[in-house]
Amino acid sequence: MVLHRTLIAAAVLAATAPAWASTEEAARAVEEPAQADAAEPASDEGESVVVRDRAGESLTSFTHLTREDIARRPTEDGNITDLLKSNPAVQFSNHGDGSLQMGEIKPSNISIHGSVAYQNNYTLDGISTNSDLDPAEQTSVTTTRLGGSDEQGFYVDSRLIDSVTVYDHNIPASFGGFTGGVIDAQTRSWSGENHISVFGRMTKSGWSRIHTDSALDVGSGDADVSKPAQFQTDFEKKTYGFTGEWGITDNLGVVVGYTRRESKIPTIQVPGTRVSIVPDDQNWTGWGVLETPVAGGTQTQRRTADNFFAKATLYATPWTEASLALTYSGYESKGFLTTVADSGYEDHHDGLNLTASVKHRMKAGVLDSSLAYTRMTDKRTSDVKNWTQLDRYTIGMDDTGSTSTTSMTSAASGGLGDLESTQSVINAKTRMDCEPVMVGSVSHQFSAGADLSSTHAEYRRGSNYYRWGVTQSVMQSDYGEFSQTDFYTTRWKAGTYEADYNQAALFGEHRMGVGDFVIRTGLRAEYDDFTKDVNIAPRFTTSWDLFGNGGSVITVGANRYYGRNILTYALYKAQNGGMENIYDYASDDSPAADGWFAANDFDGLERLKTPFSQIRQEPSPL
C-alpha cells in the first residue's frame, strides 16, 4: 500500500488588501516589519485580523491573531481551534462542531484547504505537539486495536496563548510534517507586570434553543455504535480556573495558569440483551447461549479536561531571552455504547511537554534554539473486558423445502477491552535568521536551520482480549424446528509492543528583493528511518507590489509539503501480530488446543511512502 496524495490547485493570490485590513494598515505592514508582532485593529467598528508576512511582504498566506485579538474573540470551550472559525481556509468537522454535539469539550477537527485533519501540524512555541497514535480513529471507540487518540495532543486554553498563526499556503521551509497547513501557537511570557485573574463560566441545554427537523428522530437513544454520543439534546458544561504572572526579579518572571472544563451529558441507554456463552451438552460444540434482558434508562456520560501551564522567562540581556515552559493537558471521557449491554468504558488522554528555549539577537541576525520532551498517553478501560455478538437467522421452509421467509436479529454485549498507548518524543530545533544584506540595489536575506526528533511508542494490552461471534440458524417448517449454533473466536494476545523511529530535517531559504519585487526560494530535506525516505521539498514564492503601497500584490508560488508518518503504521505489525482466529469457542478458562490461525492484516507496510501534497498557485488576471 502506498500513501501518496497529490494536490494541484490554482488560486487567486493577487488582490487588493484583505477585506478585514485597511489599505493604510496593509501598507504599514510592509513599511514597518519590525512592529508586525504588535498588530492593532484596523478600526474600532469591529474585530479585525491583519494578514502580514513576518518578513514584511505578502510571500506567505497566513492569519495572525495577537493576544488582544484572542481576548476579544468569543470561544465555545476556550480551545485554540475555536479562534479559527472566521478563517476562510479552515473548515470545521460537521461531527465535532455540530449543534447536536454541544456537550463535547474537546477541540474540533479542522481541515485546511481540504486536507485530512491529522495532516495539519500543531506547534506550541515552535515544537510539534501532534499525537500520531492513530488520530484518524478518534471519532470511533469501536476499534479493538486502539482507543483512538486525537491529532491535537494538547488542549491548551486560549487564555494562555500570546499569538496564533495559521499558515495555509506558500508556507516557509522551516515548517514540515503537514499536507494541509500549520497552526503555530506561541505561549505567553512574563510581561513585566504582576497580576492574577480568576474566571468561571457555565452553559447548559436549558439555556439554549436547539432547532431540529421534526421529521428526524434525534433522541440520544438513536445513536449508532460508532458514534455513541451522536445526539446530545441535554448537556451541562462548566469552565473555571485562573491565570497569573509575577516577577521574581527585575529580569525573571513566571506565568502560571490552570483551567478545568467539565461536561455532563445525560444519554439514553436503550434496553439490551446480555449474551453469555455457557456449557450445553445438547449442542455438538458443547456450548450454548444464554440471553438475559438488560433494562435501559438514562445514564450520564461525562467529559473532563484539565490544563496546567507554567513558564519562566529570563531576560538575561537586552539581546538574550531564555524560557522554560511546562504544559500538562489531561482529558477523561466516561461513556457507553447506546445499543450494547454492559458496554461502559472510560477514555483517558494525558499530555506532558517540557520545552527549554533560548533566543539570542546578534549583529548577524537572530538565533532561536529549543529542546523539548513530549509524552502523550491514551488509555481505555472497559467495564466488561470481552465482547459477545449474537446473530440469529430464522428461515421459514415451505412444503417443497424451499425458503419462504428469512429474518435476522442481533444482540451484542460487553466491552472493547483495556488498552494503553504512549508516544514519547525528544525534539531539538534551531534556526538562524540573518539580517538583510544590500548588494547594490538588491536586498538579500538568508535563514537556515535543523530539526531533529526521536520518537518511542508503546502499545500495551494487559490481558488477552476475546471477541466471540455466535451464529444461530433456526429452520422452521410444518415438520418442526431445527437449529444449529456455531462459534467463532478472535483473540488479541496480551503484551507490550514497541516501535522507535527518528527524523531529521535541514532547511534553508533565500529572500531577494529588488524594489517592489521579491523572490523567496527555499528547500527542506527530511529523512526518517521508518519509511527510509529522503524527501526533498522545494519552496518557491515570488510577489510583486504593483503600486508600492501594499494595497495590490501579485503572488505566485510552487511548493511541495510532506505529511506526517502516523505512528499507527509503525506499531501495526506488533499490534495485530498477536491476533488469531478459531472456528470454535475459546477463552482463557477454556483454551482451544488446536485450530488457531493467524489473522494478519498488515501486509504491505514495507512499501509505505511519506504522503505529500504539491501545490502550484498562479494569479488570475486582475
PLM segments and residue spans:
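Periplasmic N-terminal accessory/gating domains of Gram-negative outer-membrane beta-barrel systems
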Residues: 25-41, 55-172, 179-182, 186, ...
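Solvent-exposed loop/turn elements at secondary-structure boundaries
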Residues: 409, 422-429, 445-447, 467, ...
